Amino acid sequence: MVLRSEILTKKSELPTPDQALPGRESAMPVPEAHFVNGRPLTAPFPAGLQQVLFGMGCFWGAERRLWQQPGVWVTAVGYAGGYTPNPTYDEVCSGLTGHSEVVLVVYNPQETSFEQLLKVFWEAHDPTQGMRQGGDIGTQYRSVIYTFDAAQKAAAMASRESFQAELAKAGYDRITTEIADVPPFYYAEAYHQQYLAKNPNGYCGLGGTGVCLPA
């Protein structure tokens, strides 16, 4: 087992449940409305909409890329995939929560498809980098897809195999993206929500491989 001190310094190993920070019972307060489109950030969402969680590195740039997509109704950033309930950003950055930075995407399947969102996901980052994304190093930057039903999961896994074949042709390593059923999602602090709309010159580490997912 990796020591807690090694998790703090190396940022490349996930904690065990016993090593994870305890967190808290109270949820993070978040704005009522999306800064860009004014729609509600929290459920209940209108009937007929679908959801997915994408993790593709720093959630600031990832969220902007996703809210710009046709058919996306609303987005929000948060933490998922770890053990610590209602974590803070600093706790997630310590590596001792087990969470990934993720974007909640609420979309209208009449206006876009899950497959189209998967294409955006794969092409917008490098899913072969493990516990990092570019210069952002840490388990919170790992690539993840957390699905809300069996159909989403099957589509995500099929797209991973298809994109892996294209990456191999371009000389890239194996995809490290985790695909799993949706775990508890915890909203990030208010200042992280739609960060790059509030701070247009803010940091964006999002960068793809240049490889395209076949239609």
Curated annotation (Swiss-Prot):
EC nos: 1.8.4.11
MF terms in GO: L-methionine-(S)-S-oxide reductase activity; peptide-methionine (S)-S-oxide reductase activity
Active-site feature positions: C58
UniProt GO cellular component terms: cytoplasm
Alphabetized UniProt keyword annotations: Oxidoreductase
Any one GO biological process: cellular response to oxidative stress
Catalytic activity annotation: L-methionyl-[protein] + [thioredoxin]-disulfide + H2O = L-methionyl-(S)-S-oxide-[protein] + [thioredoxin]-dithiol; [thioredoxin]-disulfide + L-methionine + H2O = L-methionine (S)-S-oxide + [thioredoxin]-dithiol
Xref: InterPro entries: Met_Sox_Rdtase_MsrA_dom, Met_Sox_Rdtase_MsrA_sf, MsrA_MetSO_reductase
Protein task: Has an important function as a repair enzyme for proteins that have been inactivated by oxidation. Catalyzes the reversible oxidation-reduction of methionine sulfoxide in proteins to methionine.
PANTHER family in alphabetical order: MITOCHONDRIAL PEPTIDE METHIONINE SULFOXIDE REDUCTASE (PTHR42799:SF2)
Sequence similarity: Belongs to the MsrA Met sulfoxide reductase family.
Annotated protein name in UniProt: Peptide methionine sulfoxide reductase MsrA
Gene name per UniProt: msrA
